[in-house]
């Protein structure tokens, strides 16, 4: 019953009703739209699109000998008047804490200040890491970047000509684009995917699958933009 009440499922019902009562070319268009909508909502299309992008969560042992850890921002939210990391950011933060506890290294947190806010992503994420027992002396804040390209650009300025290898921690879907951009700036990294962030295939469509598919499409557009800028 709860699946039927999901907004994704309710909109599908509305489209089916529109198919029944529409005629001519409009009906053909709505039928095609309904099929595409269903394939996105049930997770099939998103799962197919995610195949070239996704990476399984990587064991932190891969970064046992890196010089430092780079944590990329994933947004912030305001809850009860207090700024905190977005839900999609916590897996990255926890992966960094896990990595640091096993292989203590300098941490660089990269994330600027969203429009209208007073604190940067980097500062807010750092607060969580401090609470997890990581000392302030081990954390460097990069507080200017607004996107992944700027993450790499400003971190390159911090590292200068450092040729050592760093552990790059980001989400599973963001993994590939981040690696491409950091390679573009000649920053040597071993990438760790903090989560397996993919659609869930269901019979009935749900809002979660639309959300994930939107993120996947965003990543494709970002990768296309990188290659176009190189032409």
Model-derived regions, located:
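A structural signal for short, hydrophobic/glycine-enriched beta-strand patches
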Residues: 43-210
